[in-house]
Design a protein with these regions (language model features):
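Residues immediately C-terminal
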Residues: 128
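Cytosolic-facing regulatory segments adjacent to core modules
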Residues: 23-116, 131
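Conserved glycine(s) of the Walker
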Residues: 8
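The conserved Walker
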Residues: 5
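Phosphate-binding/switch region of NTP-binding enzymes
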Residues: 42, 73-76, 140-185
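Hydrophobic positions on the alpha1 helix immediately C-terminal to the Walker A/P-loop
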Residues: 12-16
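Residues at the beta-strand->loop junction immediately N-terminal to the Walker
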Residues: 2
Length: 185
């Protein structure tokens, strides 16, 4: 998934991961920007429709309950949900903190995918991964990482969903009504 800044790439990627997890698939998600708590709040919003703003702000009301006449989710509903959620596993989130504060390379993600038996790997995002071949030019590094992810996907026979942020040039082009191009990564 490629898009400009703040257009919802992570939301879309995590939505796909959450839906796959609900179908019984094991997910490995690398989040290069957000903490596990932030990813978790988004998961709770996508999985059970809790208000993301309510979770972030510590609000007493956490959104409308689906299939009701306007009933609201409350803190005790969230606590009950968390207790039930602990009975199910298989959604692993890793961040740079899990790699001693640095960007992981594809081999490290692959090792975790094998270790946890992941059925789907989500990478958020390309620019927050490390190129094990250590290319100096970002475009070449991104090409190397993309190639390594493709080969990992092929070897493990598992889908990889990769988010990539378009650069500043893409933002300028947006003002002209143009879509991001591959060279805008």
């Amino acid at each position: 998934l490629t898009g400009r800044t703040n257009v919802g790439k992570t939301w879309i990627g995590e939505y796909f991961a959450t839906m796959a997890w609900n179908m019984g698939y094991k997910i490995l998600m690398y989040s290069g920007e957000m903490s596990t708590a932030m990813v978790g709040f988004r998961f709770d919003t996508l999985n059970k429709h809790f208000s993301n703003m309510g979770l972030l702000n510590g609000s007493g009301t956490l959104g409308k309950k689906p299939d009701t006449d306007g009933a609201k989710y409350l803190q005790e509903d969230y606590e009950k949900y968390i207790t039930q959620l602990q009975q199910k596993s298989g959604f692993i989130v890793v961040t740079p903190d899990d790699f001693e504060g640095r960007k992981p390379n594809v081999d490290e993600i692959k090792s975790l995918a094998i270790k946890h038996g992941a059925d789907m790997i989500v990478i958020d995002q390309l620019s927050l991964m490390s190129d094990k071949r250590r290319a100096d030019i970002p475009r070449i590094a991104y090409n190397n990482i993309s190639e390594d992810l493709f080969l990992m996907s092929k070897e493990l026979k598992k889908p990889v969903l990769l988010m990539a942020q378009a650069n500043r040039e893409a933002v300028k082009n947006r003002k002209k009504g143009e879509s991001p191009e591959l060279h805008d990564l």
